[in-house]
Amino acid sequence: MEEVTLDKLATDVGTTVDRLVQQFAEAGMTKKAGDSVNEEEKQKLLAHLNRQHGGGGSSEPSKMTLKRKTKSTLSVGGGRDSKSVQVEVRKKRTYVKRSASEEQEREEQERLAQEKEAEEAKLREEEKQREEEQQRKEAEAKAKAEREKAEKEKAEKEKLRKEKEKERQKAEAEKRAAMTPEEREAADKAKADAEKLKRQQEEEARKKAEKEAEAQAEEARKLAEENAKRWEEEEQKRKQQEKEDVHFTTSSTAQEAEDAQDFDEERKSRKRGKKRRRKDEESDDTPRREKRRKGARRGSSLQQGFNKPAQPVERDVKIGETITVGELANRMAVKASDLIKTMMKMGEMVTINQILDQDTAALVVEELGHKPALVKDNALEEEVLSDRQEGGEEAPRAPVVTVMGHVDHGKTSLLDYIRKAKVASGEAGGITQHIGAYHVETGHGMVTFLDTPGHAAFTSMRARGAGATDVVILVVAADDGVMPQTKEAVQHAKAAGVPLVVAINKMDKEGADPDRVKNELSQLEVIPEDWGGDVQFIPLSAHTGEGIDELLEAILLQSEVLDLRAEKTGMASGIVVESRLDRGRGPVATVLVQRGLLKQGDVVLCGLEYGRIRAMRDETGKEIKEAGPSIPVEILGLSGVPQAGDEATVVRDERKAREVANYRQGKYRDVKLAKQQKAKLENMFADMAEGDVAELNIVLKSDVQGSLEAISDALTKLSTDEVKVNIIGSGVGGITETDISLASASNAIVVGFNVRAEAAARKLVEQESVDLRYYSVIYDLIDEVKAAMSGMLQPEFKQQIIGLAEVRDVFKSPKIGAIAGCMVTEGVVKRSAPIRVLRDNVVIYEGELESLRRFKDDVQEVRNGMECGIGVKNYNDVKEGDQIEVFETIQIERTL
C-alpha cells in the first residue's frame, strides 16, 4: 500500500500542513508534520469531509424546480382600431426526489396494487365467461324451439299448398276436357306467355336488387375509406402534437407529472369557460342584436361557400404548339407539382418552366382525364398566307446563279464583262463590299447573278431551306490555283446539293495553268467532264472576254436540265438576299422574286418585319413598278431590317400583316428555346435512330496543312460499321463565321487545332449554340472524338455471379412460403438481386430474392461464411442440397 508524507499530501491537495493536521484530528487520527499517511487513512479523511459538508450520499439534488415561459400575441378590437397585445404565461413546478426507502415502499405498493388488480381482472373475466356461457345456452334453446316451430309451420303450409295445387290441377283438367282443340291451344299459349312474363319480372327484380346491393357496398366502401383516412390523419396529428410537446426534463416520472398537471389546468379552464357562457346566456333576456352598438358590424359567418363537385370535372384544355408545364397546370386547374409527378410516372423528367411540345402536352392532358383541344398558334399567319391570289400556270424562268471563289480571283470582273458595265472600279480595292444581285439579258436568254462577299448569305439561305440558288459558278484563277475560300465554296455547294460549274479565270496571263486547277479540284472530288466526271470546266478571261459565251451556254444548259419553272402572275413571294439600314431611305432589302409579280404598293410580310412597298429599284438604281420571277429588286418601306434568308410574301391586309409580324416577334424567343437542340459531344447519340449508322459531323480547322492532313486521316480511320466520322469542312487558318454557319446548318461540331475563332465567329457561336472545341495535342483531339463515338455505340450487358449459397434446411412460412436455411459459401448474397436455383448443378429456376433474413432480422446482404434465411419470389420447390446462385447484370462500356 503506497504511503506519502503529510507535507506531500498537503502540497497535492492545495492546503497548509496545519490545516491538514487539524482535519486529521477531527477525523479521529493524530498526525503531525513529517508523518506518513497510507491509503486507508486517506479514505477515512475523505469520508469524514463528505459527511461534514453534507455529501454523504449522492451528489444529485433532492429537489428540482422547473420554470416554463411561453409568449403569444393576442389581437384586441376590430377594424382599424385593432391592436396586438403580448401575452406571457409563466409556469413553475417543483419536483422532490424520494429517498431510497420511500422509493422502495412506493414500488412495493405499486406491485401489490398491480397484483390485486390482476386478481380482480381474473375474477371479472371468469364471471363474464360464466354469464356468456349461460346466455349462449339460453340462446341455443330458444333458437332450437323457434326452429322446430318454424319447421312445423312450414310442413303445414306445404301440405295445404299441395292440397290446393291438387284441387287446381283437377279443376283445370276438367275445364281442359270441356275445351275445343283451338281453345286448348290458346290457353297453352297464354299460360306460356304468363310464365315468360313472370320470369322476366323476377329477373328484372333480381338485377335491380343486385345493383342496389352493389351501390350500397360501394358507398359503404367509400365511407370506410374516408373514415380510415380521417382516422389516420387524426392519429398522425395527435402523434405530431405529442412530438411537439416540450418537456423540461428527461425523467419519465417528471414528464408524467408535468403532463398530468397540464391536463388538470386545461380541464379547469374548460369548466370555467362553460360556466361563464351559461351565466351569460341565463342573464341575456334581450336579443343579442339589441345589445349591440348602433352601426356595429355583424360577425362574419364561418360557413364554407364551396361545394365539392359530385363527379370529376372534365375540362377542354387548349394547347398551342408549345406550352410550359406551369401554364398547362393552370389550364387544367391542378398543382404544378402534381403535374410533374404525373409526367415522372409517364417517364418524363421536367421542370415547371420547361417547354412541352403539342403532342406531349396532349398525352398528359388525356392521362389526367381532360380533353385536349389542339390549337395552331399560327392560325392567323396561315389565314393571312392562304388568302392570297395565286398565279396561273407555270412558265420557264431564268436561272439564279451564285458566283463564288477566292478573294481577287475575278468574280466581279467576270460579272462586269457580262453586263458590259464597269462596277468593280467603284469598289474599295476592287473587292466586293456587299452582295450584288444582277439580272442580265444575253443573247442566249436571261440569267440572274448573285455576287457574294464570302459565303455567309448563301449558307444562311441554305440553313433556312430557301433553295434560292440554282447553279453555283466557282471562279478559280488559273495562275493562283485552289485557295482556302475556293475549298469552302466547294464544301458549301456540296452540302447544299447545288450543281457546280467551274470557271477557270485569268487564262490570258502567262502563268495560267488550267491542268493544275483541275488536279487540285479533283482532290476535292470535283472531277471535270473530260476526266469522266460531271462538272463543267470553262476556261475564260474576264479581261479579254474569251470563254464568256461558253460559260453562259453551260449555265443555260444546266438550267434546261433542271427544268426551272415559276408562275409569272399573281401575288409575289421571294427571298431576302441582303438587307441594310440606309441613312436617307430607312430599311432597304434586296429581294429575289421567286414566283408571282411584285408591284409597287403591295403589302409585304418579310420575316419579323412588314410594310407597304413605297419604291422599287433594280440593280442599276432605276425605279421600276413591277418585277417578275428571278428578278432581284431593292424595296423600301419595311418596318425594320429583315434578316438575310427571310421569306418575303405579298399579303392583302396591312393590319393583319402587322399582327402576324408582332406575333412572330413575340414567338421568336419561345421558338429559340424549343427548337431542336444543337449537336453536342455529350448527347450526340440521342439523334441516332436504331439500326441506322450514326454520323459525327466535324468542321476541322488547323494551323498548318501537315497537321490538317494528319488529323483528317486519323479521324476518317476511326469510322466503323456503326459510327461514321464525316468531315464536312476543313481548312488552314482561324475559325471564321463561314465555318460556324456551315456547322450550324449541318448539325456539326467545330474543332480547332492550334487556332482560335474570330470575334465575329465567337459571337455567332453563342447565338447558334454550336459546339466549339480547341486542342493543342493531336492525341487529345482523337481521344475525345473516339470517346464521343463510343457514347454513340449500343450498350452491352453482362451477367456477373456475386455469391453462392448452399441450402442446409427448408422451413415453412405462412406469409412467404418455403424459406431456405442457407450457408453462404462464396461471395455475398444481396436482397432483391436476381438469382438462379441449381439442383445437381443444373439451373431449375431463375427469379429474384424476396426475403433475406439473419436471426429473424431483415438484412440487405449476407457475406461469405454466414448463415441466413432466403425466400425466393414465387417459388416454393426449394429442397435441401440445392444451391442458390446470386448474380447481377452490369453494363459494359463499349470502346472502339
Swiss-Prot record:
Compositionally biased region (Basic and acidic residues):
99-247, 279-288
| Span list, region G3 | 451-454
**Where is it localised?**
Cytoplasm
Tell me which domain of life the UniProt entry assigns to the organism this sequence originates from.
Bacteria
Q: Does the keyword GTP-binding apply?
A: yes
Q: Which stretches does the entry tag as region G4?
A: 505-508
Keywords from UniProt, A to Z, are:
Cytoplasm, GTP-binding, Initiation factor, Nucleotide-binding, Protein biosynthesis
Task: Supply the Gene3D superfamilies for this chain.
Answer: P-loop containing nucleotide triphosphate hydrolases, Putative DNA-binding domain, N-terminal subdomain of bacterial translation initiation factor IF2, Translation factors, Translation initiation factor IF- 2, domain 3
> Which segments carry the region annotation G2?
430-434
Q: Where is the composition biased (Basic residues)?
A: 269-278
Q: What GO CC terms are in its UniProt record?
A: cytosol
GO terms assigned for molecular function: GTP binding; GTPase activity; guanosine tetraphosphate binding; translation initiation factor activity
Q: Where is this region: G1?
A: 405-412
InterPro entries linked to this entry? DNA-bd_dom_put_sf (IPR009061), EF-G-like_DII (IPR053905), EFTu-like_2 (IPR004161), IF2_assoc_dom_bac (IPR013575), IF2_II (IPR044145), IF2_N (IPR006847), P-loop_NTPase (IPR027417), Small_GTP-bd (IPR005225)
Q: What does this protein do?
A: One of the essential components for the initiation of protein synthesis. Protects formylmethionyl-tRNA from spontaneous hydrolysis and promotes its binding to the 30S ribosomal subunits. Also involved in the hydrolysis of GTP during the formation of the 70S ribosomal complex.
Q: Which family does it belong to?
A: Belongs to the TRAFAC class translation factor GTPase superfamily. Classic translation factor GTPase family. IF-2 subfamily.
Q: Would you tell me the protein name for this molecule? A: Translation initiation factor IF-2
